[in-house]
């Protein structure tokens, strides 16, 4: 069964609405807790000094990584009922979703574990934490008696956010950059900006809050923000 998560690269208002809705929903004991990012993370994005060399290009703002989605192949068939019965912090409701949902606290992540042996891990804040969490889930499965391996680890999406701390004229931005932009405020309050290089989707809000998604590497998040910042500054509200 194909994994169905909120769109990681929203390209129209309906997808963007679904994307942001996933941010706002409560995660406790629900399949919907596989949010792209959590609401508390987006409400107050952190600002960091760029002197650490992590990006920002001298702007003085560095996007914060909010969520990393990775996939792993455990390379064996799994009995999901057995996993749900014997593993901690695991739930399985096949009528609702064809995967075991498992959580660990360190790194704080959630895994979707499928009978095919495929696994999706969400919630990590760094690439290293994503890989560490994925290995921990694989070890849990191994300890339950399955011949699980750790194959084909791949980061599928990195989400970042930031706040430029000034209001933005979204109508003007949409008009001037119509080739890349979609802005339909009656459907979704943010402007959807589809950057070509790097291939990143940005959700830009009038408040100055920005969500960046679709990256495979963190540098793509930083590069996209460096590229969009002068544009945002051009359409700063007085």
UniProtKB/Swiss-Prot annotation:
Biased composition (Basic and acidic residues): 27-49
Domain of life from the UniProt record: Eukaryota
Signal peptide positions (record): none
Keyword Repeat: yes
InterPro entries found in the cross-reference section: TBP, TBP_CS, TBP_dom_sf, TBP_eukaryotic
HAMAP family according to UniProt: TATA_bind_prot_arch (MF_00408)
Family: Belongs to the TBP family.
Protein name (database record): TATA-box-binding protein
Species the sequence originates in: Candida albicans (strain SC5314 / ATCC MYA-2876)
